[in-house]
Amino acid sequence: MAVNYLCICLSPAIDATVRMDAWPTDGSIIKNATDTFAPGGKAVNVARWLAKRGASVACGGFLGEDNVAMFEKELKRYGIEDRFVRIAGSTRVNEMFVTPQGSFKVNRPADGGPYKGLEGLGSLEGFDVVIMSGSLPKGWPDDTYCMLVEAAKKTGAKVVLDASGKALVEGVKAHPDVIKPNAEECEPLIGFVPKMPEDFKRATVALKAFCDYPIISDGGTGCWFDGEFVAAPKVEVLDTTAAGDTLLAEWCFSGDFRLAVAAGSAACTMPGGEPPNMELVEKLKESVK
């Protein structure tokens, strides 16, 4: 039976990647940088991978009217149902700066407009899985995800929450089915940052007070799925923008731990959140432990 997915992205972003030949020094002028721009936001990245895998997927949230065309084109390209509400202004631009010596990212706060309730998102009925992912727009209530999780659960859907900070702390009060914090994001919930394998196992047990199934990302090392560790394969990293989102999307689609980690690693080889080739994902899965 086909599964219908809804991805909720309250904080979409245009992901700009700037590549430079060298790490800039104080006062330096970079003359030969290249840049790329791609529509993104965590739940948009999730929706894109689900669509690439052939799933029936809708994506909703709030988009600024001034630069909405890039998102409309991308959603149409992947056959994703567009449920975004258009608001005045522009969608934020996040920037990743990449050099041979390292990289860093600048994330701007999302502006979803003044909070006017969640009715504008439309009905959550008719979906089997609802995935809520990303930060909240500035000025929005910390319990926004809590309200959304409650609303989605009333429809009978499986609810996945990928958030951090106060949005996560408040969101888990509605007990989503799945959460996906990284190690640092666990601390506000359980009081410690897992570092060693026994820490992650203890964290998994503690997180079950807030959800049925915790997934804990350990960055480039790998991922813990309900206490079971899957190591990430080695790849040449180009851009980590959509790695965790692709991992989550693949797990939601197939439930295959190894394939999910392989998909997340493959995403690191692609620019600007572009989905990786499925052949690469399958090849990487062979080396996933």
Regions found by a protein language model. Give the residues of each.
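Conserved phosphate/ATP/ADP-binding segment of small-molecule kinases
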Residues: D142-G227
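Hydrophobic anchor at the start of a short beta-strand
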Residues: Y5, A55-V57, D82, V159, ...
